[in-house]
Amino acid sequence: LTCHTCPYNTCANSETCPAGKNICYQKKWEEHRGERIERSCVANCPEFESSHTSLLCCTTANCD
């Protein structure tokens, strides 16, 4: 599985997920500098927190 890794809405960078991390995720939240995005490979989908504006977990290549 490969997942996007850059902190932008449009992302060309991907990484191959290590063994045991078979979920791509994308988390968005607002800061004083504007919207922040975090993307990576994870073993379990993180919980949605009240500070997040969106949370996406998926299992197909570059779906985040």
From Swiss-Prot:
GO terms for biological process: modulation of receptor activity in another organism. One of its GO terms (molecular function) is acetylcholine receptor inhibitor activity. It is found in: Secreted. Keywords: Acetylcholine receptor inhibiting toxin, Disulfide bond, Ion channel impairing toxin, Neurotoxin, Postsynaptic neurotoxin, Secreted, Toxin. Expressed by the venom gland. InterPro entries: Snake_3FTx, Snake_toxin-like_sf, Toxin_cobra-type. The keyword Disulfide bond applies. Transmembrane segments: none annotated. GO terms for cellular component: extracellular region. Produces peripheral paralysis by blocking neuromuscular transmission at the postsynaptic site. Very weak inhibitor of the endogenous nicotinic acetylcholine receptors (nAChR) in the human rhabdomyosarcoma TE 671 cell line. This neurotoxin is lethal to zebrafish by injection at the back of the dorsolateral region, but is not toxic to mice by intraperitoneal injection. This is Long neurotoxin MS5. It comes from Micrurus surinamensis (Surinam coral snake).
